[in-house]
Amino acid sequence: MDQKVRQFEVCTQDGSVDRHGNPAIRANTGKWLTAILILVNQGLATLAFFGVGVNLVLFLTRVMGQDNAEAANNVSKWTGTVYIFSLLGAFLSDSYWGRYKTCAIFQASFVAGLMMLSLSTGALLLEPSGCGVEDSPCKPHSTFKTVLFYLSVYLIALGYGGYQPNIATFGADQFDAEDSVEGHSKIAFFSYFYLALNLGSLFSNTVLGYFEDQGEWPLGFWASAGSAFAGLVLFLIGTPKYRHFTPRESPWSRFCQVLVAATRKAKIDVHHEELNLYDSETQYTGDKKILHTKGFRFLDRAAIVTPDDEAEKVESGSKYDPWRLCSVTQVEEVKCVLRLLPIWLCTILYSVVFTQMASLFVVQGAAMKTNIKNFRIPASSMSSFDILSVAFFIFAYRRFLDPLFARLNKTERNKGLTELQRMGIGLVIAIMAMISAGIVEIHRLKNKEPESATSISSSSTLSIFWQVPQYMLIGASEVFMYVGQLEFFNSQAPTGLKSFASALCMASISLGNYVSSLLVSIVMKISTTDDVHGWIPENLNKGHLERFYFLLAGLTAADFVVYLICAKWYKYIKSEASFSESVTEEEEV
């Protein structure tokens, strides 16, 4: 007994192991020492990624010769692909490689893509010399050069996308959720992770954004490559101290087993109160049994023990056929995923709003007054106000708002806003951001310059600083939506699907970018005629960008109504270990 108590005090209790596969020693592994390495790594990787992404729309117009709508669509598709690759990274991590190996491999791919882009830009794409600035576009490129460019940027997408969901979950793995102190740190980690992400992009949006706007594209891309390489080295330095979780069997196999087993037993009545449900012991240390719930009753058939199951067990020796009989925990894992999907779908439209910051906000800013005396402000650098807003609201929420809401909360849980409530607030603020952007565009058009009919540069006397409110509102909405989303999916996902849960957040951004691209194409097709330039033409002074912003505000408002219904319907996951705690089956939204 004393030995067990001693092991409980010395080792982590969540099933994490060290790099040799032994139970992780609490004092020698994980916690903030390794988490800080991961946070700095995230900051450097984000600096590198946004060193490319923040001005990619301008690179496509000035160097690759694309118009505004085409460039905005291509940026949306590229950003969407980045986050689609997050699903691949999550699958490999949860099923085969583990989070550490997955992070290392995809970061190496990320560095390789950045180096390829840096080399190809300096040696091949900037022709003639000195091109790539606003008044001096580059000449058309050959098919080979264009293919090389897209190969490099999509290799960057593969590396960064596959790495992102795993580094977030790997950072959370450094804290033992079964320990009260480390459990609190684990929750706080996601806020600091998102803060590191934004602070990392601050340098890209200001310094690198300025040099790239001046045509120094190779310098900006090489700085990004160097930052990514430094981040990879820093990540590897922490190898001896990291805590790991052993990869589970493929979550998709477990998912399919439940569906197949339930289908095979389709004729069984699941509404009978005395069901003989099968539940096995957990396979991995630290795993928790998930308690049976009444939703999605048709899936319970997969856990009903039938005479045929017993007969097959006798024939095979000692085990049930996993494609005929699944444990209650395995069935509940599928239910967890199905319950998450409606919430996840409601976050996609928010990502449509969010992606405008990297595309149409930049195009809009470039068509405003960007000079302060002799200094020219790059339109992309305005996203610095988004980053400052994120930093401010993360600090304000953790230090002031969360404790305030906790005191006002009269329920037994005595906690602040739930993750679902915070995500709803994020949607409301996003609506305000689109309305603000539309109002700014109305005023920009009222102050357009006469000569803008032949030039889209500085085509309005309205200062670019009028964009500050829309950037600040987007930043505030991110703190409530994306941080809440990370915490929500990570806490509600089964043990073997933690990386997949983080990938859901990335996939939401991905689909948001694709939907944004589709929406722009549809709007342009409908609004463009022989004598009308459409809402988002190359010369914004001949369009109606404000209508597109107001359209997004209306769609997001409708999405918010649907979200309220889905959030009210959602039932929180309950595990065996937490059943004795005062956790209600439903939480108020």
Swiss-Prot record:
Tissue specificity annotation: Expressed in xylem parenchyma cells within the vasculature. Expressed in siliques and flowers. Higher expression in shoots than in roots.
Any one Gene Ontology cellular component term annotated for this protein: plasma membrane
InterPro entries linked: MFS_trans_sf, POT_fam
One matching Pfam family: PTR2
Induction (free text): Up-regulated by cadmium and nitrate.
Domain of life: Eukaryota
Transmembrane parts of this sequence: 32-52, 78-98, 105-125, 147-167, 187-207, 217-237, 343-363, 377-397, 423-443, 464-484, 504-524, 548-568
GO biological process: nitrate assimilation; response to cadmium ion; response to nitrate
Localization terms from the record: Cell membrane
Function description: Low-affinity nitrate transporter. Involved in nitrate removal from xylem sap. Not involved in oligopeptides transport.
Protein name: Protein NRT1/ PTR FAMILY 7.2
